[in-house]
Amino acid sequence: MMVTLKPLNMLTATEAISEIKGGKITATELMESCIKRIQEIEHKIKAWVYFDKEKALIQSKIVDKKINEGISTGLLNGVPVGVKDIFNTADMPTCMGSPVWDGFTPGNDARAVAYIRWADGVVVGKTVTSEFAVHYPGSTVNPNDYEHTPGTSSSGSAAAVASYMIPLAIGTQTAGSTIRPASYCGIYGFKPSFGLIPRTGMLKTLDTLDHVSFFSRSIDDLHLLLNVLRVKGSNYPYVHKYLDNSSGIKQVNDYPWKVAFVKTPVWCHAEEYAKDSIIDFVSKIDKCDGINLEEIELSEDFNLAHDVHEQIYSKALSYYYKEEYENHIDKISDMFKEMVEKGRRVSYDEYMKGLEKQNLFIHQLDYFFDKNEYDAIITLSTAGDAPRGLYTREKKDSCLIWTLSHVPAINLPVF
């Protein structure tokens, strides 16, 4: 049946769905092309901790059978999807990037995974994560340069999409675990607003910071996967008003767009070439019709964002991973031990004050958008290109400011 000239594994999800619906290719042919690519390059990229081609093909054939029998299919229509190895999967191990959980199979699907399956997405396997989705990296390398980091913690998901193994993958972000890998690997990465995607069945590190996120090679694919994963219905009044009802969403041609260029308190840590690139990009945006662009500064309170994040994050890790630290200390990294021990030194009062400061950031950014009627903020995703080596600590960037503040963040690979 295959008639498209483009290698199928290089199709975006939206393109693949169009080809499948048009009868030009089958879901199985798409999956076979992705499997071939995985077999060709996985030994170099090391993006997968679990992959079973037979399971993937069975899922694809089920979708084709539904199509052939005239049964309606879900939004994903047979598209292959990678799942970060901190989401429960009923039929695959979930090891959280740690030997402590080697071979653990939870026997149920995380809500996000269930939504993917219900939309007839093909769950290909589990992608590499850093240890407990924190700092200590897995084995994945950057597809653009094997001697450089792909970014943590959603490294496998970003690398699998960037290297054309799959068109879509889900990850998480508690600081910069999606925006940073997406930037380093040169693809789209999206962390929606806090709470927009259910976290049931996902590894917990901190209730007020953990976000579900995802990766793609096109902006249309982000929109597609958001509609698959997000909450819906009248039980979520704001979502129901502005997302379920598309008339409540500002459209591309609804001019003018008001955009803020924000350097953020960590601008000084960015490489000069990164600063020059975004300033050049912003100058081009400023010349576009229908866009009003202003350079603004966040309040001085945001100078404390990184300290606040470290304080509440380390404290939460010391609580949630007490069992691993006390009973499996020989199986956890020195880096993770250091985080837990740092958290143990944070008092309850200090933790609560940290949460109060986070709440201040949330309200200040809400006020910032409402008062000034900004539609978007443009800023650097990272401080520069992917650093050399897997164990290099990245320079401070603004990612965690947006995570702390619960606002959506997206990496656009535009320069």
Stretches found by the model and what they are:
Residues M1-L57, C288, E350:
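An N-terminal boundary/leader segment
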Residues G23, C34, G78, K84, ...:
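Glycine-rich, small-residue loops and helix-cap segments
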Residues K24-E32, D64, E272-E297, Y321-N327, ...:
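Acyltransferase
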